Swiss-Prot record:
The gene is TAP2. This is Probable acetyltransferase TAP2. Keywords: Acyltransferase, Cytoplasm, Nucleus, Transferase. GO terms for molecular function: N-acetyltransferase activity. PANTHER family: ACYL-COA N-ACYLTRANSFERASE, GCN5-RELATED N-ACETYLTRANSFERASE 2, CHLOROPLASTIC. Does not interact with the effector Avh52 from the pathogen Phytophtora sojae. Residues 106-248 form the N-acetyltransferase domain. Its main location: cytoplasm. Its EC number is 2.3.1.-. The keyword Nucleus applies. InterPro entries: Acyl_CoA_acyltransferase, GNAT_dom, NSI-like. It is found in: Cytoplasm; Nucleus. GO terms for cellular component: cytoplasm; nucleus.
Length: 248
């Protein structure tokens, strides 16, 4: 179990997505934040948690995404640090122009509008298939569902956009103190571009803005060190993640 360490937030903060998905293997660890204090009610604490993330968010995205001059990272509306407003539920994260004039936008959304059939199609590209009814229930019962959609616009094809789900992550929560991140998926064709980092960082930022400070996730053993380097800690203060499995 890995926990996100609030004290480790810096201007260079970024998070590498984990690749553990149901069913959990015996080599999976639950990762959680080391700051386990529940005193998150004061305005000063909220500002500390959200504003420390602000500086490094777009810089980390740009460093991973801007590989040529035809790609543009579009910043969301800025806000004064003393009175930061929550980011919009949907905005253009990346826009790039291909040699043939086709424009592709990567849209980030935290509104939870993910089609279950689109999600199943994404899972079929490298993750275990799950029953549609359970996928729908998981989405419905999540606290936050964050997604990435690719929208492609070809020259002369106004009104005929191609929209495709290319990434998703979700969080469950008690709506007060704790949240766990699940099902981090990025289309293999879009991996290695920093989109997974952007997706998870935005999800964490949204949780912190909602005054939820204990953020955990599951990670395969081979990526635990990546999370330690990014502010997550395994077994903070000796606290263990425990699992119950049926005996049959």
């Amino acid at each position: 179990m890995l926990t996100f360490n609030l004290n480790a937030i810096s201007s260079s903060f970024s998070v590498v997505p984990f690749h553990a998905n149901y069913p959990l293997s015996t080599q999976t660890q639950l990762l959680v934040p080391s700051n386990l204090s529940y005193s998150f009610a004061t305005t000063g604490t909220r500002k500390f948690k959200s504003f420390q993330l602000k500086a490094g968010f777009w810089e980390s995205i740009k460093s991973g995404l801007m590989k040529n001059n035809s790609m543009q990272v579009i910043d969301p509306p800025s806000a004064d640090e003393e009175d930061e407003e929550p980011l919009p539920q949907e905005f253009v994260l990346v826009e790039k122009t291909e040699p043939d004039g086709t424009i592709e936008q990567i849209i980030f959304s935290s509104g939870g509008d993910v089609d279950v059939y689109d999600l199943q199609a994404l899972c079929d590209k490298g993750w275990p298939r799950r029953p549609l009814s359970k996928l729908a229930a998981a989405l419905k019962n999540s606290y936050i569902v964050a997604s990435l959609h690719s929208i492609r616009k070809s020259p002369g094809s106004e009104g005929n956009e191609q929209k495709r789900l290319i990434g998703m992550a979700r969080a469950t929560s008690d709506h007060a103190f704790n949240a766990t991140i699940w099902d981090v998926l990025v289309d293999p064709g879009y991996q290695g571009q920093g989109l997974g980092k952007a997706l998870i960082e935005k999800l964490i930022r949204t949780l912190l803005q909602r005054d939820i400070g204990n953020i955990t996730l599951f990670a395969d053993s081979q990526v635990v060190e990546f999370y330690r380097n990014l502010g997550f800690e395994a077994d903070p203060e000796g606290i263990k993640g425990m699992f119950w499995y049926p005996n049959h």
